[in-house]
Amino acid sequence: MKQLIRRLSRVADSAQYSLLRSDSQRPSRRSESFLRSSVTRRSKKQTSSVPEGHVPVYVGDEMERFVVSAELLNHPVFIGLLNRSAQEYGYEQKGVLQIPCHVLVFERIMESLRLGLPVPIDVQDLIGDGTI
């Protein structure tokens, strides 16, 4: 787990990570269209606005809010995250959709999906064994 966190820290510090930014930062035109169409991080001031075809999800212990395209909910990796959520919080949870996953891991997953890359094996293992 420590090795994964170290790797995620390097990804977070790299230039590639800049493709996925919070709403408070100015994204490039290329990443801006992706952020609008699949996942964005919203500031607390913008919590009420969810674009049509998107779903708000809260990630990690920090309850970081992301707005995710509903199309991503059918992706096998996202289904794995939803299954982890069901195991952690139960199916009858009321209120917001929570993903029990570290924010950096979630961002890495979304970045892989955005780039059309397979989700890295170490992340798939984390989803599968419930240690995210």
UniProtKB/Swiss-Prot annotation:
Residues 22-54 are annotated as: Disordered. Residues 23-33 have a biased composition (Basic and acidic residues). One of its GO terms (cellular component) is cytoplasm. It is found in: Cytoplasm. The keyword Transcription regulation does not apply. Keywords: Auxin signaling pathway, Cytoplasm, Developmental protein, Growth regulation. Its main location: cytoplasm. InterPro entries: SAUR_fam. Highly expressed in the steles of roots and hypocotyls. One of its GO terms (biological process) is auxin-activated signaling pathway. It holds the Pfam family Auxin_inducible. Provide a mechanistic link between auxin and plasma membrane H(+)-ATPases (PM H(+)-ATPases, e.g. AHA1 and AHA2), and triggers PM H(+)-ATPases activity by promoting phosphorylation of their C-terminal autoinhibitory domain as a result of PP2C-D subfamily of type 2C phosphatases inhibition, thus leading to the acidification of the apoplast and the facilitation of solutes and water uptake to drive cell expansion. Plays a role in the regulation of cell expansion, root meristem patterning and auxin transport. Interacts with and inhibits PP2C-D subfamily of type 2C phosphatases such as PP2C67/PP2C-D1. Belongs to the ARG7 family. This is Auxin-responsive protein SAUR72. It comes from Arabidopsis thaliana (Mouse-ear cress).
